[in-house]
Design a protein with these regions (language model features):
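Surface-exposed cap/linker segments adjacent to membranes
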Residues: 1-19, 34
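Short, structural beta-strand-to-alpha-helix junction motif
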Residues: 20-21, 25
């Protein structure tokens, strides 16, 4: 893949000479970040940063270009990761514009030892390649359009799942097949058809925080499953305009371990008398 090759060449400061497997096999983490900065009268600059961890050493290189065009080819494939024999974590992010060419996660299935996988700003057609990552503990897919989580069923080691800022999740039913899952984020405007499957989970952390003006996404949603999460420790309901004091009391009654409840900009936060003193302990 031209995008992956360019990123690795930048990281290794190897613009032309041959790159062999031995050059990358010892890398434990690889992070590729592309961001466009709007600087007013100074114009627009696009910056790509590539970072890697190799044992206790950190490698980092950066390249920039004037304008919205990336100084490196866009990432379109993960097949080259098969050469990173020691890789435990991979992260790719592009903002504020999504990489429309990054639609295929094929190639990642060879990385059965991967523990952390994070992608922001792609448009994956399917998550099936991720189903082979049996050691995956943390998964983040943000600004990735519409996602069908079905292929994630059976990832027995997955503890944290971040699905913020997506257009839509087809169904939350697959999260009930993730026995180790303790943290789930659906914040910043990710639409879901129902919260009912969450009642079958053992979540400790649930982030449903919305941005200003996004409350309409939950206009028809039944909130009652949130009062059926006995293991809950942290819950974010920011900007949910249908969350009342009465409902918050139901949550507190059924979640004895709850220590943090964010109800900013909800009816429950407007002069209500929630009995939440013990949450501050």
């Amino acid at each position: 893949d031209a995008g992956m090759e360019a990123a690795v060449r930048l990281l290794l400061n190897r613009p032309e000479s041959t790159i062999s497997r031995s050059d990358v096999w010892g890398l434990n983490t690889l992070t590729i970040t592309e961001r466009t900065m709007f600087e007013g009268d100074s114009g627009t600059t696009t910056i790509v940063t590539v970072t890697a961890q190799q044992g206790d050493a950190t490698l980092e290189q950066e390249i920039s270009a004037v304008g919205k065009e990336s100084p490196l080819p866009a990432l379109a494939s993960l097949h080259d990761l098969q050469y990173f024999d020691s890789l435990q974590a991979f992260s790719y992010s592009t903002s504020p514009t999504a990489n429309q060419a990054f639609t295929d996660f094929s190639g990642i299935e060879t990385m059965s030892h991967l523990e952390r996988f994070s992608v922001n700003g792609a448009r994956p057609e399917t998550l099936e390649p991720l189903s082979h990552l049996s050691q995956l503990k943390q998964l983040s897919l943000t600004e990735c359009g519409t996602l069908d989580l079905t292929p994630l069923e059976g990832l027995d080691q997955l503890e944290s799942l971040i699905l913020s800022s997506n257009d839509r999740i087809v169904s939350l039913e697959p999260v009930t097949k993730l026995p180790a899952l303790r943290s789930l984020s659906l914040s910043s405007g990710t639409a879901v058809p129902s919260l009912e499957p969450l009642a079958q989970t053992h979540l400790a952390v649930l982030d449903l925080g919305l941005g200003v003006g996004q409350s309409g996404l939950y206009k028809e949603i039944d909130y009652s499953p949130l009062s059926q999460l006995p293991d809950l420790v942290c819950l974010n309901l920011t900007n949910h305009t249908r969350v009342t004091t009465k409902f918050c009391k139901q949550i507190l009654a059924h979640s004895p371990d709850l220590r943090f409840l964010n109800i900013q900009n909800t009816p429950a936060s407007e002069g209500s008398a929630l009995d939440v003193e013990y949450l501050r302990a």
